[in-house]
Amino acid sequence: MKLLYTDIRTSLTEILTREAEELVAAGKRVFYIAPNSLSFEKERAVLEYLSQQASFSITVTRFAQMARYLVLNDLPAKTTLDDIGLGLAFYKCLAELDPKDLRVYGAIKQDPQLIQQLIELYHEMTKSQMSFLDLENLTDEDKRADLLLIFEKVTAYLNQGQLAQESQLSHLIEAIENDKVSSDFNQIALVIDGFTRFSAEEERVVDLLHGKGVEIVIGAYASKKAYTSPFSEGNLYQASVKFLHHLASKYQTPAQDCSQTHEKMDSFDKASRLLESSYDFSELALDVDEKDRENLQIWSCLTQKEELELVARSIRQKLHENSDLSYKHFRILLGDVASYQLSLKTIFDQYQIPFYLGRSEAMAHHPLTQFVESILALKRYRFRQEDLINLLRTDLYTDLSQSDIDAFEQYIRYLGINGLPAFQQTFTKSHHGKFNLERLNVLRLRILAPLETLFASRKQKAEKLLQKWSVFLKEGAVTKQLQDLTTTLEAVEQERQAEVWKAFCHVLEQFATVFAGSQVSLEDFLALLHSGMSLSQYRTIPATVDTVLVQSYDLIAPLTADFVYAIGLTQDNLPKISQNTSLLTDEERQNLNQATEEGVQLLIASSENLKKNRYTMLSLVNSARKQLFLSAPSLFNESESKESAYLQELIHFGFRRREKRMNHKGLSKEDMGSYHSLLSSLVAYHQQGEMSDTEQDLTFVKVLSRVIGKKLDQQGLENPAIPTSPSSKTLAKDTLQALYPAKQEFYLSTSGLTEFYRNEYSYFLRYVLGLQEELRLHPDARSHGNFLHRIFERALQLPNEDSFDQRLEQAIQETSQEREFEAIYQESLEAQFTKEVLLDVARTTGHILRHNPAIETIKEEANFGGKDQAFIQLDNGRSVFVRGKVDRIDRLKANGAIGVVDYKSSLTQFQFPHFFNGLNSQLPTYLAALKREGEQNFFGAMYLEMAEPVQSLMAVKSLAGAVVEASKSMKYQGLFLEKESSYLGEFYNKNKANQLTDEEFQLLLDYNAYLYKKAAEKILAGRFAINPYTENGRSIAPYVQQHQAITGFEANYHLGQARFLEKLDLADGKRLVGEKLKQAWLEKIREELNR
């Protein structure tokens, strides 16, 4: 046994490589052991330091893989499982346990998170050389019983099936202990690099090999000052020093100091010594000069995105200045990998910097996992429509085109069907021939056939089930689709998809191993497959050696690269505080360690935090050979953050914090580097003139199109492919002639008028192009309205001999039996429930009709307008016709005055501001149409809300009070003529603001005609502006801006071309209500008409 240590600015790998070469010269075969996270880097470094750059006698490997290189006499007869297989075994054993048998974990026994934690605990106990029976020492009785039962069942199952989950080190330990290793130990040597602690399993291997006479060399970083100090607690080198002291004591071998004498102390050595003296409370006088501050820079940035851009620019600049540099000379360290992963790809692709993030990716969100999840959901939830749509959307099932999938989805949404029997029936329903039923039935059979065959599978042996699954993948064209999808991808992405497919096949292999000979149902198989895929991870290797490596900062080793950029070093990320998320608490781990024999140790993360983090900081400061950049953003994940205390210490020593910002207001040589990045800088620079005070979050193409469009506009040029703002063209004359022939009547409805004043282009889409909403066969708001209208129409037409309640019930019964409504509301339990709710609404609304003796209903669903009577006359002599339907016409019994009623599903009131702006013309239009048909005597026009009133019981003192308050909301809302208001009862909301004189009534009708005239002239001229209205001058309401994907209108960029609603000109702070508000708007109407 030989123990070495060196100062952190001397390459430990170089020293240990020399030791390895000496051992080779002595005839030894050397295993150069490195930690898992550093093995690839160590291999490259060792090859560089070897005098011949190669050696057949030196193998750079990891502890776990060393067993492969030693010849074992008896290979284990058992089949080895990996984590996926072990997870499946846990899933199977837990599924067989009754929830009542588990006191703590019964309710979550098949939860993926619990299974993951059980796997981790299984591995931890194996590495710590601890037996599962040691769990008997747990003090929590319920947890002890559960864990012992679970591990006992899993262990019995693995032994029964000749399955092994032991690590390779366990096999090696067993082989060495039983003399089953045929390799000559005298010809073997170990060189161990990069460790500051061994697991119990690793230490056991070292102990056994040392006992067999194997020469072992172990090296670590430590200063002589730290190693010889009698007190190491809190020291930066505490982790490595304690490690060396433990080994020196155990093997009675003092550690040798191999530190080299450096001619000049570099900046990083200086920072290391200052940090060390700070933590061991010794005094050290060292001056930090400008060169040191240049070599070790501390950046303060605003955002993570800015950090990455600054790093990318810096790399590009250095490559531009020094042609000898390449990407492999740079290393990027991340404070939090997940937070930077997406932005990293976007920005580095923009700057054309190849990078490799050595991180495993989870398969949980891959389309292949979603494919399995959709099939499981189809089986488990009996063929829901949404699950079938999700399956088709993965683009992995069947070779149907996107247009076929869209047509099929549209049709099954129209039908609203669920359940396999419904899908097995031939499609026969169509909406006026809109759907191609013949084609849809061909698609239905193509989609259902493989699924029907698969779902017909009963519980059977795993081997047979896998055969059926293989047939399903072939018939469903899954493998073909995956292959076709990957052929169009880049080479790197093709490799990624290949790794995904390997992981998928591996899950199936592990399933076959674990369940060999077992009876498995299809649903259990799909659940296990989905569970295995959710636990699976895959990773790719870099396509080239010359790439910028990106990794988490806590995996760094000293002297890794020439230039190192460590970003995201906030207080939350540096230091990283390891949290215990396992099934055993720190206290339970401590108790188990004390109760078991020496050498059997579970790791307690919290006890390792301090010494591990200080050593990590030391490695971080010394990670660069030439220049190191440490950065912390002020905003991390959109919340304020502080820089790490370690960075503040460096600043205290004399290193300077540099405020770094991206400056788009000027261009400099730093913007040079790559074509894409330069173009991006130019775009950002030109953006400043129009949007300097707003934070942009647009794609590169959008920004570029806006800037180029602006430049073209300045030159008097136009490119319709890149407009500066959304605009529409006036329709051509021949188009207008085809749409609105001079000899043909032009009709404009009140709903069309409202749509026009909401957004002119929306009118064009709906009423000119005929854009329709998605069809639904199931009952919707329209069918609910028709149902209620029909009930009231029938109830009011029945003879008055019976009471109103009897007539209403008769109307409900007869309407419910109509074929149209019977088909809709008897289709499903959900539809029947909806019908009951609607009937409650009908009975509640009937309360107003039942107790209203002052009026009588003379017409229901009355049509108005038509060819006989023009609504308005345009200046060019062309007539505009309005036609529509009034829900109900009432007449006052006292004097025969007419009133118009419109049913609404929610509370609707007449509002003068909306009427003035063309958004509330329904009631005036009804009155004007009836007046043109000869009616002269009116009492008003109103809305009736058809809904059950909701009253908060907290706002009233008694139930009787609730009834009174609820009845207040059940009133007719609208416009009433002042002279007739005395005849109207309590069911009419006839306050002063809603009452009109004859002159005011006529004024409203005149202005309403004016609104129709303005709209008709624009429509007939073919001018449809993209101008959704804004009520507050800051945003557009969602129901106004329904066609954003078509128009491209974005409120935060194009608000200037929105229509700002006209408002009253009031003095600051003045507010009008009631009668005064009405009079102010009427005066504004007079002014508008007199212009």
Swiss-Prot record:
Phenotype upon loss of function: Cells lacking this gene grow poorly, are more sensitive to UV light than wild-type cells and have reduced double-strand exonuclease activity.
Metal-binding in keyword set: no
GO biological process entries: double-strand break repair via homologous recombination
Listed cofactors: Mg(2+)
Keywords: ATP-binding, DNA damage, DNA repair, DNA-binding, Exonuclease, Helicase, Hydrolase, Nuclease, Nucleotide-binding
Domain of life where this protein originates: Bacteria
EC number, UniProt record: 3.1.-.-
HAMAP family: AddB_type2
Note: Despite having helicase-like domains, this subunit does not have helicase activity.
Family assignment from sequence similarity: Belongs to the helicase family. AddB/RexB type 2 subfamily.
Assembly and oligomerization: Heterodimer of RexA (AddA) and RexB.
Role played: Involved in DNA double-strand break repair. Is not involved in recombination during natural competence or in plasmid establishment.
Protein's name according to its UniProt entry: Exonuclease/helicase subunit RexB
Native source organism of the sequence: Streptococcus pneumoniae serotype 4 (strain ATCC BAA-334 / TIGR4)
Underlying gene: rexB
